Amino acid sequence: MHGITFDIAHMLAGSLVLVSFMQLYQDRLYALLNIYALHALVLAASVAWQAFIQDAPHRYLTAVIALVFKAIIIPTALHRIIVRLGIHREIETVVGVGPAMLLGMGLVALSMVVMLRVTADADPLAREDLAFALSVVLLGLLMMVTRRNAVSQVVGFMSLENGLVLAATGAKGMPLVVEISVAFSVLIAFIVIGIFLFRIRERFDTVDVSALDQFRGERGDRM
């Protein structure tokens, strides 16, 4: 597994990290959802390529799931939620874009150092893909931490899960049932979070999670 196949696998995994940075940089909800759709599209391409080079036809089903659910259905549904909630605005962040990007670069560097050392005896392609996957996971987690808007936190969570799928497909012999269970777990979580967003909107007239903190503080003062 060398030459062009090796290079394409790395290019796709690296592209997923790059798109994760694009999500971290974005400060508008519509654009963020479009970039997440691109994130899922790159994931689907990466999984399909892994299916080809590993000669694992069942991986193609995982790629189709990523393409249909993650790149089309979920972004479309979130677009509709945004329209119904009337939250066409910029995303409020805990820290600025600059510090967030610097933190992201630090997390990617940490991922590379840790994974390449821990997996020193593993297959070269697998260990580098795992390093990229951990980078995607940590960038998704960073996005959840640095965003106040609940919708953007949902996108961060789904991006994190994309990193887990990348790690699972990069490891040979990973059962398909694991990948399917992860995908449907995210779908269920998406439904629950969608209901939760409507409840927040009805109660607080906003989806900014800082409203919840303020409400808890007011209740604490009364008690």
Describe the function of each predicted region.
Residues 1-223:
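Alpha-helical transmembrane segments of multi-pass membrane proteins predominantly involved
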